[in-house]
C-alpha cells in the first residue's frame, strides 16, 4: 500500500494534478539554511540552470515593488537571492528572446524592427549558435516549455533544431490560454500548441500557465539530477488575451478596473506556477545545485492592465517603462545573498554568464554583445558592462522633427534609437508613448482609464537623461549638455557601422494555417526561401514564364498580404 501511494504521488505530480494543491504554506522557501553573505560551497558539477521568462509583466507588477498584486513566491525567491535593480531588457517580445538566446544586439541579428509575425518567412539567424546549443556542447540536457516567438517558417527554425532536446509550447506571439488559437488578422487563424515538431491537439483545453508548470515538473521528475539540466520556461502569461481561472479572479473581486483585475489574477497564477516548479526542484534533488533566473521580457502593456509605475512609458517604447526589467537570481550557490544589486545587466549578458557557469567558453569569435556578469551578481563585484545599445531601427525613421543636421551631422535624429552610456541615456526619433501612468485601479468604462495614457506633445527628436540621478526621465538635459549628446550620437554611429541589414520580409500567403491542417507551422523549404529572397530583391523576372504562370495565384495572394501586412498589421504586437 505504501509503495502504491509513493507511485501515485510521483505519477500525479509528474502529470500536474497534484502540483497545484499545496499542503503546506511556504514550501518555496524550504531548503538549506542560508548564511547571508557567507560563500557557498562550490558545486560538485555544473549547476542546473532554470530560466523563467514572463511575458508583458510590468515593473510595478510584483509584490516587492509595492504592487497591489500578490506574488508571494517571487517576493520570497527574490528576497533570498539577488534582486537586479539595474537590469534591462527589450521593449517587445521577439527582440528580448533573440538577445537572450544569441547574446547579440538586434543590430547583429537583423531583427531590429518590430517582431517576427506568424506569416513572415523569418526566424532567428540559422548561422548563429544559440545558448542551448552551447549548453549542449557542455554536456547539458536542454528543455524548453512555453512561448518561442523566434520564427518557424522552416523546420530548421524550430526550437528542437536550435538546441532544445524537447519543446512544448507555442510558436507564435500570443494564443488563447485554453484553445491555443491565434489569429494573424481577420480570417487568418490557426491552432498553435506544439510538442516537439508535432501539433499537440490533445492538450487543448488546459490553461497554459498550469500546463507549462506541469510539464516543467514532469521534466524534473524524469531527469537524473546528477546530469546538468537547462530548463527554459517562457510563460505566455501575462500577455493578452486577459484570461484567468475563476479561482484567481475571485481574489481580486474588489479591484475596480476589469482589465487590471484579470491581469492581477494571471500574475498570481503565474506566481503559483513558479512555486510549483521550485518545489519540484527540491522534491527531485536539483535545488542545492541550481541557479534560478527570473526575468520579464519587456515592459507592461498599460492599456491591458499592466503597470510600470513610477517609470515612464510602457511596452513598445524605449522609455524606462519599456526596457527596465524585472529580474532576480535565486540560488544556494550565490556567495552574497539577500541583497539588491545595482550592477548594470542586460538580457544579452545571460548567454556568456550561463555558458561560463556551465563550464563552457566564449570568445570574440562568437560575436557576443553580452558580458559574463556572474561575479557581479554572486559576489557583488562591479559589472563589466558600462553601456547598452537599446536598439537602432532604421526602418522606423519618421520623426517629423528629426534630421541629420539636428544630429550635428553625426546621426539622423529621425531614426528611432536609444543608448545608455554610463549614467547617460540618449533617445532619438520617436521613442513611443511617454507618459507616467499610475496603476489602473479606476473602474473601467468606455473612455475612462485608458485615456490616462496620452501621447506626449513631441516637438523634438533628441532626449538626454542622467538615468542614475533621474530614473523616471523627468528632466531632459539635451539642451543643457550638447557635449554629451554629441558623444552619444557618435557612439550610435559607431554601433550602426557594425549593423547587418534588417530582415523584415512581407507576409507569405502559404503560411496560412488552412494549408497546414488548421495549425500554425513550418511551410517553406530552403529552396523556397531562396526563391522568396530572389523575388524580394527584384529578381523574380529571371524565373521561367511557365513557372510564373503555375504560381499565379500564389503571387497575387502574396502581393495582397504584403499590403495587408504593411497597412493593417505593422503595429500589432
From Swiss-Prot:
Cell compartments where the protein resides: Secreted; Endoplasmic reticulum
This protein's record includes keyword Iron: no
List of catalytic residues: 93 (nucleophile), 149
MF (Gene Ontology): metal ion binding; sulfuric ester hydrolase activity
Disulfide bonds: none
Superkingdom, taxonomy of origin: Eukaryota
Glycan attachment positions: 276, 288, 466, 496
UniProt-listed Enzyme Commission number(s): 3.1.6.-
Binding site for substrate: 147, 239, 315
Cofactor note: Binds 1 Ca(2+) ion per subunit.
Principal cellular location given in the protein's record: secreted
Record's compositionally biased regions (Acidic residues): 525-537
Classification via Gene3D superfamilies: 3.30.1120.10, Alkaline Phosphatase, subunit A
Post-translational modifications: The oxidation of Cys-93 residue to 3-oxoalanine (also known as C(alpha)-formylglycine) by SUMF1/Sulfatase-modifying factor 1, seems critical for catalytic activity.
Residues annotated as binding Ca(2+): 55-56, 93, 297-298
Positions bearing 3-oxoalanine (Cys): 93
A UniProt-annotated Pfam family: Sulfatase
Keywords from the named record: Calcium, Endoplasmic reticulum, Glycoprotein, Hydrolase, Metal-binding, Secreted, Signal
Signal peptide residue numbers: 1-23
Entry cofactors: Ca(2+)
One cellular component (GO) term of this entry: endoplasmic reticulum
Biological function: Displays arylsulfatase activity at neutral pH, when co-expressed with SUMF1; arylsulfatase activity is measured in the secretion medium of retinal cell line, but no activity is recorded when measured in cell extracts.
Protein family (similarity comment): Belongs to the sulfatase family.
Protein name: Arylsulfatase I
Organism: Mus musculus (Mouse)
Gene: Arsi
